[in-house]
Amino acid sequence: FKVTPALLHRTVKALILGDLLMKCLYRVRPYEVEKGAANRLYEQWDVIVREALEHHGFSKTAAKTPWLKRRYLPYPVLAREIVKSFDALPLKDVPRKVRVGVVGEILVKYQPDANNHVVDVIESQDCEAVVPGIMEFMTTRPYITDWNEKYLGTGGNKTLYALMRWSLDRYNAPIKAAIATSHGKFKQDDPMPELVEKAAEVTSIGVQAGEGWLLTAEILELIEQGCPNVICAQPFACLPNHVTGRGMFG
């Protein structure tokens, strides 16, 4: 295949919407009244989002879904309806469960077969899993150009990175607006500049091998959001992750 602007546009939207679906699913699943309801809702949205991204916002599955009944779902509407549907899912009236965060090497963090199904284990212990999104990992470079320029002399094209930051803000705006309608049920992610500042208080932004300083920033973000229990998952052979992950735990 050929990488085109249109493909990149859809890829960014897919990654951001994937993060949103993960956030919503993990937030409500431990509290669902009807077992399996959250997974079924996720599976419906998985099909709808795929169709909408592939067919420029149109989804035949969405048109046939009783609680949706609309064929055209542009990106902002997708975000809003995803949050709305998960927010409306019936939940048990119980206190918030102990939250356990998951950070680490990018494959092990998200791939159930690689992390021994860590989210399932967390939920089986009557806890709630919290996993930072993959877009944070994919978009660190534009936010550390000043540090790289000052200390490494290789900041890159500042105009290009400024354009990337502006574009990412535009992509994230509908997600933030959608999450805001849930009145606190779903947490907003910290802006990337704030994550850079958090990490700089504990480690150096020059720690860029593997997940680098971002892993530290995610741990701090989780702690500040009321999730002091954090699993740092890493494969045996990933030395940078062992150093930055285990080192920061120490």
Segments and roles (model prediction):
Residues 1-250:
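An N-terminal assembly and electron-transfer interface module characteristic of large anaerobic redox
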